[in-house]
Amino acid sequence: DQPRSRGLGDVYKRQRELDADAALEVLAVAVSALHAFVQLNWTGPDLSWDAQSLLRSAAPSSFPPRDPEAETDAELQNAMQAASLEFLTKQGEPAYHLCEAPVLLVFALLVLEALAKHSAGVRLPSLVWWRVRAAAVHHRILDEPVRTGSVLDTLGELAGRLGRAAAEHADEADAWRHLQSRALLERGLALQREGLERDASELFVAAAQANGLEYELTGAPGKRTRYQKHETTQLVLLAESRGDGGSGERAADEASAKQPTTLALNDDTLLEHTEFTRTSTTSRLAHLDPGAQPPLQPTDQCVLLALCLNIRNTQPMHGLTTSEMAAFLERVLAHARNWSVHTMGLLLRSRLEMQRTRTAERATLQLQALVDQMPTADSHVEERLRYFHALELEPRWAMQAELAEQYATLGVLRSALEIYGRLQLWEDAVRCLALLGRAQEGIELVDDLLHGRKVEADVVMQQKRIATSASQVRPEHFSSARAAKLWCLLGDLDVAHAEEHYQRAWDVSQRTSSRAARSLGGLYFAKGEYRPACEWLQRAVRINALFVRSWFMLGCSAMGLERWVDAAAAFRKCTALDEDDGESWNNLASCYLRMDETQAARLEAVERAAEDDGASLASDDASTASADTTSTARDSGVEVESDADEPAPAAPAAGGGGGGPASFHTF
């Protein structure tokens, strides 16, 4: 510990002496570490060096001497892995425990944060952008989404500065507008991860306008099947980039000949692509042939993919939504301009095609091909990373888990179980065991993991069909956040002792597990014990406020206690997270009907004050979670007192009469 402290002290001392050039070099080192982490866990190919050797060579005095007889530095690697994962736990949500070299991400986050606090960081306009990117990568390895925080607002300010620079420098306006488009797009993706789809949609449209992308979703006559004789109107996306559709990007992106493998449909009825007939139209894109449109800039392709995701997130999943998304994907996949962009397009197409019998086979094989290509070096690293931050590309383990989910959908449960076991995604593995009629085996699996019972790997393979030796790991090797999730999973499975297991999860996490608090709140809510349900759900939303169902149950519990102001605050948060939640709107109206003027005025005043102060979720997980006192919605901008001092009734009225809620929807 002492050598390590001296090493960090030297680093901080040097940071105080940075000049502009040195600050830029430090930023470059942080970005390199961030991209090395991304390369290992997202884009591939695998690196030829490991983080432990690199850190040892950079600061040998900060690490204990290595055993010369050992083939690998396993002890140091395990210690760094555990410490890094503990650092990356945020708002009670653990990072994926099998991610590669998390110390690289920790290093990047710490260096970027130190630069932001240093006076030299002011002279680095792009520092804000890289902090947002690092935070986005961090949040994408967490089990559940969390708030990004105020750093997103600074990226919005940077986008505004880029727009003004485009207006002031006419000769370089295209370059400035391109940067503005990227900033708007990445901010929109971050908001979309938090569930703010409406705000994200506006940013995606603004990104398209900034980069000069023109697009229109329209209809054109065409044929979709091989034996179709008469043309019918087909949905098509007409899109055109500014200028020649590539400018300086074209040579850079098309120079790489290797692109992700696109599997053919090979169906005896459906055509590979819709055959369109050119027809006259009055739109600005009337000059485009629907079946032979020009290539798009890769950035414009990223915008269209983001809009496609936004359609899925804001509309119910039915045939019309699928057709609309397919039109966007067909336009992007028509021209392979970049490895990562094309991979993202193929991934989204696979998700859509899994819903149809005729295309499910290609969807599964295509996803398998995407998983297999990750570790290969068949394309340049620069090309894979160039547009990574402008995409919602899944990490390696998430794509493998998605493949397992497709196997499970097709009924290939044993293959799905093998993948889940290899990835140590125990919740999904237990679900597969239940579908195989082996629910008790799932309970035993989780219990073995928590209590560290020794089971040989070959026994695990034979008896539980899971090719992993993770069950040999003793409990102390689990991080507190991960152990808490396992206890919650055991509570889900062992219903008779659920409350005991959830409480154990809360204690193990040192009062930082949103999952445990949500589970306890839901358990008491199902029992009709609304007072403890309110307390636990309030703890849950203070730690992580992005779960609509937690807010909804909190509002219903407050209605059961006739605390109308608290209930209204919770339902307002529900409607802010999901504007189409009709039950929350209904219950919100019911709360307002039962509030007197003083209560309504207090609610409005508190919300306005919170909005003026820019209230948001506190980033310190431990401090927010360890408090025993509860508040309705700290990060929703609402903090109110109880409506009455006298004890509230223990259960709500069932109908609309009397003093009970007019609409009490529990699900």
Cite the ranges covered by each PLM segment:
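Single conserved hydrophobic/aromatic residue that forms the stacking wall/gate
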Residues: 1-12
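Long, acidic/serine-threonine-rich intrinsically disordered regions with weak helical/coil propensity
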Residues: 197-204, 257-381, 387, 556, ...
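Short coil turns that delineate tetratricopeptide repeat
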Residues: 212, 454, 510-511, 545, ...
